[in-house]
């Protein structure tokens, strides 16, 4: 994958996250600026998702730890655990929002 392809795919992922948050019906504020998406919850905790263009990765920081995701066969997966991005994000957001929700690209 070249840099242009990465940027298109990563920007599409960030947009899909915004849409999934909006569609969830849960009160989560989000702000996207320049490849960085910040989710802010009622309890003032945050999840920060950002592009790491030089590495062709997506980084996610929760209040607990950080994760690096790489694109493998059209699916973003955690470099350490192998967990799929949307499953991870659903769990992280559910924990920080203190309510169960499932996010996905639609």
UniProtKB/Swiss-Prot annotation:
Q: Name one GO cellular component term.
A: cytosol
Can you provide one Gene Ontology molecular function annotated for this UniProt record? ferric iron binding
* InterPro entries to which the protein is assigned, alphabetical: CyaY, Frataxin/CyaY, Frataxin/CyaY_sf, Frataxin_CS
By its UniProt entry, which Gene3D superfamilies does this protein fall under?
Frataxin/CyaY
Q: Where are the transmembrane segments?
A: none
Q: Which residues form a coiled coil?
A: none
Q: Keywords for this entry?
A: Iron, Metal-binding
Biological process per Gene Ontology, one example term: iron-sulfur cluster assembly
User: What role does this protein play?
Assistant: Involved in iron-sulfur (Fe-S) cluster assembly. May act as a regulator of Fe-S biogenesis.
- Homology family: Belongs to the frataxin family.
What is the protein's given name? Answer: Iron-sulfur cluster assembly protein CyaY
User: Gene encoding it?
Assistant: cyaY
